[in-house]
């Protein structure tokens, strides 16, 4: 009897660590985006962060609002999602401060900031 080749199986499981998995700046978004997100149209930039553990999103908002003229557009402490609003330079600086502080001070793994 001929032996059948065995199939290796791999189970991948996400185990959250201390991570900033998304840090993105949307400069001058379209008005439709503001409307769909329920954000004020008076700002010129949106910053988006996704952080684990999700409780660190509260720390991220504290860092961001203390860094300059940004507002919290949305904070979900259960999923780690953060949306910041303000002018482009203020939101960009806030994202830099959040990723730097979480990365260097708190030893999170932080992704680079992306921009559109």
Curated annotation (Swiss-Prot):
PANTHER family: BACTERIAL MICROCOMPARTMENT SHELL PROTEIN EUTS, ETHANOLAMINE UTILIZATION PROTEIN EUTS. SUPFAM superfamilies: CcmK-like. One of its GO terms (cellular component) is bacterial microcompartment. One side of the hexamer is concave which is lined by hydrophobic residues, the other side has a slightly protruding, 6-stranded beta-barrel. NCBIfam families: PRK15468.1 (NF012012). Pathway: Polyol metabolism; 1,2-propanediol degradation. A minor shell protein of the bacterial microcompartment (BMC) dedicated to 1,2-propanediol (1,2-PD) degradation. May selectively transport specific metabolites. Not absolutely required to make artificial BMCs. Proteins such as this one with circularly permuted BMC domains may play a key role in conferring heterogeneity and flexibility in this BMC. Expression of a cosmid containing the full 21-gene pdu operon in E.coli allows E.coli to grow on 1,2-propanediol (1,2-PD) with the appearance of bacterial microcompartments (BMC) in its cytoplasm. Overexpression of this protein leads to multiple smaller structures which appear to clump together in the cytoplasm. Artificial BMCs can be made in E.coli by expressing pduA-pduB/B'-pduJ-pduK-pduN-pduU-pduT (in this order); pduT and pduU are optional, while pduA, pduB/B', pduJ, pduK and pduN are essential. A construct with the reversed gene order does not make BMCs. Ethanogenic BMCs can be made in E.coli by targeting pyruvate decarboxylase (pdc) and alcohol dehydrogenase (adh) to them. PduP(1-18)-Pdc and PduD(1-18)-Adh strains targeted to the BMC (PduA, PduB, PduJ, PduK, PduN, PduU) make significantly more ethanol than strains where Pdc and Adh are not targeted to the BMC. GO terms for biological process: propanediol catabolic process. Keywords: Bacterial microcompartment, Transport. Belongs to the EutS/PduU family. It comes from Citrobacter freundii. Residues 9-108 form the BMC circularly permuted domain. Homohexamer with a central pore lined by a beta-barrel. Hexamers pack into a loose array. Interacts with PduV, probably via the beta-barrel, which is predicted by modeling to be on the exterior of the BMC. Interacts with shell protein PduA. It is found in: Bacterial microcompartment. The keyword Transport applies. This is Bacterial microcompartment shell protein PduU. Pfam families: BMC (PF00936).
């Amino acid at each position: 009897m001929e032996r059948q080749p065995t199939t290796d199986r791999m189970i991948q499981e996400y185990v959250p660590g201390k991570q900033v998995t998304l840090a993105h700046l949307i400069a001058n978004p379209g008005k439709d985006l503001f409307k769909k997100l329920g954000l004020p149209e008076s700002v010129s930039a949106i910053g988006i962060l996704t952080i684990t553990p999700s409780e660190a999103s509260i720390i991220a908002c504290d860092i961001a609002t203390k860094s300059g003229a940004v507002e919290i557009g949305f904070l979900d402490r259960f999923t780690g999602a953060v949306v910041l609003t303000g002018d482009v330079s203020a939101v960009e600086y806030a994202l830099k401060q959040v990723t730097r502080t979480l990365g260097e001070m708190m030893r999170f793994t932080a992704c680079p900031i992306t921009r559109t």
